[in-house]
Amino acid sequence: MGSLKKRSVNLAGHATSLALEPEFWAALDRIAKQDAVSIAALIQRIDVGRGERPLASACRVYALQRAGG
């Protein structure tokens, strides 16, 4: 996997920066397109359901779960 790429997203009215490998960003972009939502809306959905898990980890797990099923 490549080096981390940072993107800024707005979550619950707060700007936050999220660093993921390009492959995970590509997977999340595909998922957002499939679900007809913006990448910000998808990440907000992941954020709401992540519990205690760090957001970057939750995004990676979500992408892997969606890829597998």
Regions found by a protein language model. Give the residues of each.
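Short Lys/Arg-rich basic patches
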Residues: 1-19
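Aromatic side chains
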Residues: 14, 24-25, 62
